[in-house]
């Protein structure tokens, strides 16, 4: 089956805007039952500048004619989770997707924004402001150092520091100041899927592409889940949609242009550093020559003084 590559922001955004797919995606990743999920009024994107008129730039100056393409995409949801003890709790689900490890500080900035939020929730006595717990999901288009797992969960444990035992009870105040994190390393997604999580991740596997831009791929794994089927069908439709394919191609060129600009900037820095090193070597050579000239002058003066002494001795001997 021909489907659109969901790592492209325009495609992933379409998936997350579908409530059923978003619920299935989050529920499968965090491994908890979600009773309800709603996207918050905005999604945040970081925009990278790319050339509007040229596919490839010869110099960094060429990047002055630009347009904007998404570099980071972020979605925020409010979800009601059914806990293992049968109770319900509201949480904020933050999903961030990026292809570069250099986006770490942006991730931290977005997280700080969430901690500053004041959410209004319904309670028995009416509406109240409340700091909801946060769950972060990061989709990474790069590999983390020394970790080969495709999906990683970093969770909080309450530990009694005196007895060194785990505390099973949870506290809303503590939960509001800490959060669980889920990390998906897209480059490590590979192999035949077996579990529900692996089947979901298999959609993001970066293999079996039809073109060099990696916009379209062949998905041939068995589908035995209605939600997964709906997700794949949406990707199939996106693959045949001219507007979506054009947006994916533009994003691919944006990425290529950004890589080229980074290469040129790196090349310019290396050239500047090499020139600086050469200038330093030339300056050191100049100083060395000056020192040698001084040494020669001193030797000449010494010889001149000795010659004078010899002449004086000769005059004295003639007397």
Language-model segments: residues:
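Generic amphipathic alpha-helical segments used as scaffolds and interaction surfaces in large
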Residues: 12-17, 187-191, 218-222, 226
């Amino acid at each position: 089956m021909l489907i659109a590559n969901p790592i492209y922001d325009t495609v992933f955004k379409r998936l997350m805007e579908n409530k059923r797919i978003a619920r299935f995606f989050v529920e499968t990743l965090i491994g908890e039952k979600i009773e309800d999920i709603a996207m918050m009024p905005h999604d945040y994107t970081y925009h990278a500048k790319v050339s509007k008129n040229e596919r490839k730039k010869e110099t960094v100056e060429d990047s002055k004619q630009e347009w904007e393409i998404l570099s980071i995409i972020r979605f925020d949801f409010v979800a009601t989770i059914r806990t293992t003890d049968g109770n319900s709790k509201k949480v904020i689900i933050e999903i961030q997707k990026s292809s570069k490890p250099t986006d770490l500080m942006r991730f931290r900035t977005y997280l700080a924004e969430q901690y500053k939020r004041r959410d209004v929730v319904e309670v028995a006595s009416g509406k109240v402001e409340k700091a909801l717990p946060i769950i972060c999901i990061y989709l990474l288009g790069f590999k983390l150092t020394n970790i080969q797992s495709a999906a990683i969960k970093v969770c909080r444990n309450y530990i009694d520091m005196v007895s060194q035992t785990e505390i099973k009870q949870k506290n809303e105040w503590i939960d509001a100041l800490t959060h669980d994190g889920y990390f998906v390393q897209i480059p490590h997604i590979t192999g035949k899927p077996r579990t529900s999580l692996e089947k979901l991740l298999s959609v993001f596997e970066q293999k079996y592409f039809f073109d060099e831009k990696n916009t379209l791929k062949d998905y041939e794994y068995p589908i035995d889940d209605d939600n997964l089927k709906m997700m794949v069908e949406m990707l199939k439709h996106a693959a045949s949609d001219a507007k979506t394919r054009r947006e994916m191609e533009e994003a691919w060129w944006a990425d290529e242009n950004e890589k080229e600009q980074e290469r040129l900037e790196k090349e310019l820095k290396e050239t500047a550093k090499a020139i600086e090193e050469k200038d330093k070597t030339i300056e050191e050579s100049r100083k060395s020559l000056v020192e040698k000239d001084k040494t020669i002058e001193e030797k000449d003066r010494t010889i001149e003084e000795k010659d004078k002494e010899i002449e004086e001795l000769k005059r004295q001997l003639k007397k």
